[in-house]
């Protein structure tokens, strides 16, 4: 029972870290791109607001953490593109780093074999790295859906505002497809196969 609770806690901690990290990277890029904004309110720095309870439940059930995005009011196409790309790149960096740690075996981590360790406390870091890999792959796949508030929506808004308007009109249908994909566990299946392929 301790092992199950430990694994659930580690999964929730990894999901919360990814949600906060993903949104904070976008916040730094926004501050860099919008240098004319002198006074930045404290609301974006309250990082616990980025942790979504539904996203935590989805991270436990489907390995797809969804963070509450901070809604940037951006009219500049270049800033929209930079925000979307920053979100995608941040998730790719976490995915590549955790897969590299799993593949190269840093810190006693040897691939996906964490249950052979003699004591449960020795398994904390390997389980954390595995969940970071799985959850970042799931969050990356989710953010590549053309939903207006996700990273792909920001990229489309940066490339073509007319296409973004069309995407907003079809947002309900795309969200329905996204929910079906998450419920059918297709993102988790694809993410786990991708990670096993890299290992």
What are these regions (language model features)?
Residues 1-199:
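Hydrophobic transmembrane alpha-helices and their immediate loop junctions
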